Amino acid sequence: MTALSTISSVYGPVDSWRVGKSLGIDLIMNTSTCSFNCTYCQLGFIQDITKERKLFISTEKIINDFNLSKWKEADIITFSGSGEPTLAINLGEVITKIKHITDKPIAILTNGTLLINQEVRNNVLNADLISVKLDAPDDKTLKEINRPADGVTLHSIILGIKELKSDIKDLNKSTKLQIQIMFMPQNKNQIESLAKLLNEIKPDEVALNTPTRPYPAGWDIITRGAHGEDTKKIKFPIKPLKTLSLEEAKNIENKLRELTNLQIISVYKN
């Protein structure tokens, strides 16, 4: 495993099909920690599956790392890294401090499990883009694909997303709400059910994705931003994941457009 004492909490910029050159902010770092344990996660099998919020990395270190980073080369600053960013209790504080340094847009990639918590929603509302994962239309599929922490249900996730959207409207925020769907063999035939949820939520945008990075057998911090040639630096064996064909992806996109009339972007278009 990489010596963490020499690793920055800020990495990149890396190329992202969704947002361009993205500078990553890792609020967790020391171990992979998430309220999901997705079967396709680029971090591999999550070491700490939890819903408990805490301080992982001090705000001071993160801001110091940010100032030393190549942030001026980035198009956007993205909170992702070694797990679920909303688990970090200093998420909101870090966002505020970074906004004092730069006006570059800030994105948060989240699985939505903690959005039911008002404090968490307050933490994320100053972001410019909140991208929420939604791969499953029911609890059975949620457990198959996302393997959530105990107590997490699809109902609680959907309710949290709706509350977030309501907060954005009530506070007159310009925050963009995106729903990201990772299509896998387990959910590719559930388009109608997912479309129904999307019509309930009415996000500003839907991002269709399929795994583009392999699933490592173990965790190494390099996996938080590994793309292309970088995946060869991972010290653990990696397992390629089955993805959708271009034809399947086009059919899914066309069907979702037909059923939702929402703004849709797709990894296959980039």
Where are these regions (language model features)?
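Canonical Radical SAM [4Fe-4S] cluster-binding loop centered on the CxxxCxxC motif
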Residues: 4, 17-57
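Short, well-ordered alpha-helix to beta-strand connector turns
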Residues: 38, 74, 127-128
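Short glycine-centered, acidic/aromatic-flanked micro-motifs in structured strand/loop junctions
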Residues: 27, 79-81, 181-183
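Glycine/small-residue-rich loop that forms an oxyanion/phosphate-binding "nest" at active or ligand-binding sites
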Residues: 73-74, 79-81, 98, 106-107
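Short glycine-enriched, charge-decorated loop/helix-capping segments at active-site entrances
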Residues: 51-54, 144-151, 222-223, 238-242
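Conserved AdoMet/S-adenosylmethionine-binding subsite of the radical SAM
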Residues: 86-222
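Auxiliary Fe-S-binding modules of radical SAM enzymes
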Residues: 2-18, 29, 64, 187-270
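Conserved alpha-helical substructure of the radical SAM core
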Residues: 44-79, 93
